[in-house]
Amino acid sequence: MSPLSTGHVFISYSRRDTEAMLRIVSFLRGRGITAWVDNEKLVPGTPIWEREIEKAIDKASAVVVVLSPDAKESVWVLNELTLADEYKKRVFPVLVRGDFRESVHFRLVTRQFVDLRTNEERGLESLGAALSRYLDELKQIEEERLAAEREAERQKQAELARIAALKAGEERIAKSKLEAEQLAEEK
């Protein structure tokens, strides 16, 4: 993450949920949240596209997973969830189609999800608010981390300056002793 900014939000979805994914992405971008979507970022024919997806999840601040019966059956959605867990990313589940049992993967059953099935506008507002809060928290943590790094560097520089001053003082004392010895020998 660059200083004082948050990374993108990775969007995990089944191709059959592309329309719902596009509405979610449009809403998030309208709120100033950067969304990473594979069909926009991957160049067709890229031989290592799986690695590009992994890198995108690794660099993401969070993952939004679009839930539906098709998403639950998707090997790719499962792989992306696995990577999100592996990279310790906060996952925001969004239910767009189907009932809970047929749409929500067992790895997500204990997580609160956003339901877009009955009131999409209210659900999107809820998702946007939750993501904004979380991204603000990450930004605050990053600011605190950078401040701590700056303070540690300041303390390190102060210690180096103190050591240099002590060394210079010791050299002056040694030089004075030598000069005093030379004067004593001359007498």
Q: Where in the sequence are the language-model features?
A:
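Conserved N-terminal substructure of TIR/SEFIR domains
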Residues: M1-V66, D70, D85-K89, R122-E137, ...
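Short, hinge-like loop/turn segments at secondary-structure boundaries
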Residues: I53-A56, L108-Q112
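Conserved nucleotide-binding/hydrolysis micro-motifs of P-loop NTPases
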Residues: A71, R97-E102, E120
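A short, gly/pro- and small-residue-rich
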Residues: W76-R90
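Conserved beta-strand/loop subsegment of P-loop NTPase cores
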Residues: V91-L95
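Glycine-rich, charge-decorated loop segments at or immediately adjacent to ligand/cofactor-binding or catalytic sites
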Residues: D99-R111
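Short acidic-hydrophobic, aromatic-tinged amphipathic segments that line or gate anion-handling sites
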Residues: F113-N119
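Long, low-complexity, compositionally biased polyampholytic IDRs enriched for Lys/Glu and Gln/Arg
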Residues: K139-K187
